[in-house]
């Protein structure tokens, strides 16, 4: 059975056998569809609701 995931930052679908998984020290698993999403969340600490290219932006606006 193939499991599909959603990106933890932008909310986009991640096709099977792609994407990156990040495990925090507390055991939380974060899935990212691209290096861009990973950097924006972990390195730059951006809010996904303020970026136009994320799905959470369209839900808020």
Curated annotation (Swiss-Prot):
Record text on cofactor binding: Binds 1 zinc ion per subunit.
Domain of life: Archaea
Gene3D superfamilies per UniProt: Ribosomal protein L24e
Keywords: Metal-binding, Ribonucleoprotein, Ribosomal protein, RNA-binding, rRNA-binding, Zinc, Zinc-finger
Residues where Zn(2+) binds: 7, 10, 33, 37
Cellular component annotations (GO), alphabetically ordered: ribonucleoprotein complex; ribosome
Cofactors demanded by this protein: Zn(2+)
Entry's Gene Ontology molecular function annotations: rRNA binding; structural constituent of ribosome; zinc ion binding
Pfam families (alphabetical): Ribosomal_L24e
Start and end residues, zinc fingers (C4-type): 7-37
Biological processes annotated in GO: translation
SUPFAM superfamilies per record: Glucocorticoid receptor-like (DNA-binding domain) (SSF57716)
Family (UniProt): Belongs to the eukaryotic ribosomal protein eL24 family.
Subunit record text: Part of the 50S ribosomal subunit. Forms a cluster with proteins L3 and L14.
Protein name per its UniProtKB record: Large ribosomal subunit protein eL24
Originating organism: Metallosphaera sedula (strain ATCC 51363 / DSM 5348 / JCM 9185 / NBRC 15509 / TH2)
Source organism phylogeny: Archaea, Thermoproteota, Thermoprotei, Sulfolobales, Sulfolobaceae
């Amino acid at each position: 059975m193939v499991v599909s995931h959603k990106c933890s930052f932008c909310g986009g679908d991640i096709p099977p056998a792609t994407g990156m998984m990040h495990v925090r020290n507390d055991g939380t698993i974060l899935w990212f569809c691209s290096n861009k999403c990973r950097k924006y969340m972990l390195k730059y600490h951006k809010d996904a609701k303020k970026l136009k290219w994320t799905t959470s932006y369209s839900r808020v606006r």
